[in-house]
Swiss-Prot record:
Family, per entry: Belongs to the radical SAM superfamily. MoaA family.
CC cofactor: [4Fe-4S] cluster
GO biological process: Mo-molybdopterin cofactor biosynthetic process
InterPro entries associated with the record: Aldolase_TIM, Elp3/MiaA/NifB-like_rSAM, MoaA, MoaA_NifB_PqqE_Fe-S-bd_CS, MoaA_twitch, MoCo_biosynth_MoaA/MoaC, rSAM
Role of this protein: Catalyzes the cyclization of GTP to (8S)-3',8-cyclo-7,8-dihydroguanosine 5'-triphosphate.
Involved pathway(s): Cofactor biosynthesis; molybdopterin biosynthesis
Name of the protein this chain belongs to: GTP 3',8-cyclase
Catalytic reactions of this protein: GTP + AH2 + S-adenosyl-L-methionine = (8S)-3',8-cyclo-7,8-dihydroguanosine 5'-triphosphate + 5'-deoxyadenosine + L-methionine + A + H(+)
Amino acid sequence: MKDKYGREIDYLRISLTDKCNLRCAYCMEKDHNDFIHNDKLMTLDEILRVVKECASIGIKKVRLTGGEPLVREGVVDLIKNINKIPEIEEICLTTNGILLGDKVKELSENGLKRVNISLDTLKEDRFKEITRIGTLDKVLYSIEKCLENNVKVKINTIILEDFNKDEILDLINLAYKNPIDLRFIELMPIGEGKKFKGVTNSEILEIIKKEKKVLSDGKTLRLNGPAKYISIEGFKGKIGFISAMSDCFCEDCNRIRVTPEGFMKQCLHWKYGINLRDKMRNGISDEELREIIKKSIYEKPEKHNFKMKEKDEDKRFMYEIGG
């Protein structure tokens, strides 16, 4: 369905949990352990109910996020049941990759088509530094197993000043021999991210252009999402740029989000939305739930305003909202 600005909203992102098995420095405090109680999370049945009603009004793609979605029990069955909904054309997962390698075969067999894996460095010492407790080999193993099981892979990378800027060319080489898309995502000033200085995608592109033959400039190659892609001579995969800060893409936004506790967010930046979990637990019918979702989608804000401090901005961290 369309929102009031005429944008076709066909993509639902649902966060299964705020829990994570890493503590990435720009996302979560090192000693954080105060997570949403299980009884406050949407149950898997409630999640499935939301997906069904969203599908009935035009949602075609579902992405499961977190936190780290694979720390939530029952993910395989949830994907299996979502895959039975006729209107849903694609089920995707955003993950840090630590637990994915040993689960991807079963996930794929039950309907998972794509994964986005967060990876900011190819150096073990830096990986430990940024994630605090992670193991790089597990992520690389997960990428390998995804390719073996025909699950399409996108790598999400954040470049930070004075941390991994010198690895840009090494990182894009992941897309050289493999059909992997690597996307550079500009750091957004949410939660712990406000403490770091990110590198703009225009600067990253210039670094790439100095060393590689770019076949397309990315100005028009946008494929059903916020990323603009370039092709590099000899590369099997593409290089993408998600420039939320320097190149606002809100006019093409096609998504709606639901947090772990069932709050349907109209926009990542703003605090507007409605708690679907509470409505369901208060006994509303499927038809009433559908109408609430339709109204929330229709009232989606025109754009974010991350560059300005606003009284109505969402103060929560990314892992609480759903990355």
